[in-house]
Amino acid sequence: MARRNKARKRKISPDSRYDSVLLMRFINVIMKYGKKSVAEKIVYNALSSAEKEVNERGVSIFETAVENVTPSVEVRSRRIGGATYQVPVEVKKDRAVSLALRWIVKSASAMRKKSGKGFFKCLCSEILDAYNKRGGAFKMCEEKYKMAEANKAFSHLRF
């Protein structure tokens, strides 16, 4: 065990346009090589095009999409007596949200590689898919839930 103090959690300031901490976390997930302004442009363009399609505020579309993709349970490997079991465990809220954000970005980039469209268009369509409870990120969430459901018998082996 580490003898140092626990690592402090960083405070994330809300973004300038929508005043949302969740959106700033998403921008930080998208950001590559420290280019935050590029990531902000991508996210804001995707949200503005999503606003035009749904006729709702962009940040509320995004929050609903993240809520739909957020997992409630996941499986963790636990080794007992030479056998490894997949034990279903509840996900902490902070981890669940960060998983949802990563899944949205991952499925949007996979869509970009397949289709060859710009990233913000793929991100927009992935956010709308998550908003409507379909798409790659929602499928990842469903797979986590199914895996936990299949291994429900090992839930007594909790950590």
Swiss-Prot record:
One of its GO terms (cellular component) is small ribosomal subunit. InterPro entries: Ribosomal_uS7, Ribosomal_uS7_bac/org-type, Ribosomal_uS7_CS, Ribosomal_uS7_dom, Ribosomal_uS7_dom_sf. Keywords: Ribonucleoprotein, Ribosomal protein, RNA-binding, rRNA-binding, tRNA-binding. It comes from the Bacteria. PROSITE patterns: RIBOSOMAL_S7. GO terms for molecular function: rRNA binding; structural constituent of ribosome; tRNA binding. Gene3D superfamilies: Ribosomal protein S7 domain (1.10.455.10). GO terms for biological process: translation. Belongs to the universal ribosomal protein uS7 family. One of the primary rRNA binding proteins, it binds directly to 16S rRNA where it nucleates assembly of the head domain of the 30S subunit. Is located at the subunit interface close to the decoding center, probably blocks exit of the E-site tRNA. Part of the 30S ribosomal subunit. Contacts proteins S9 and S11. NCBIfam families: rpsG_bact. This is Small ribosomal subunit protein uS7. It comes from Wolbachia sp. subsp. Brugia malayi (strain TRS). The gene is rpsG.
